[in-house]
């Protein structure tokens, strides 16, 4: 898979929350994880259940979760590419209401992996507080970033500090 074929590639959100950039990469990789194809590297704050890179596989039926601890995160490193993000979709796992679903988080972008700029922030949000809930968040397209971080900034709906995700999808434009 040549990264150049994704230069100036764009998918904007319409009404299909999990048919974005990762879904397209998955298809172009012959229905393989884009991380296995070398297109992206996914870096969790830690991993104890499954592989964090699976959150970008369309229709993944399991989930990734972090250890208990403050400010867990997952970073999407586009390596040779950069993304101008305009929307993202999150899907939580199959736990009941008021369990470990995200409640407060931020999405941040960086080009050096150290200094991050805020892209979107959700505080005390209840959109994902149910079994397999999903939601898409849209905003003005960002500058191009190599790294996108989803950082949990407060306790989840269970009042704990572990992060759980089933699926993540990004929309916007990729460039070299």
Predicted feature residues:
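Trp- and acidic/polar-enriched beta-sheet ligand-binding modules for extracellular glycan
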Residues: 3-8, 44-47, 57-74, 94-176
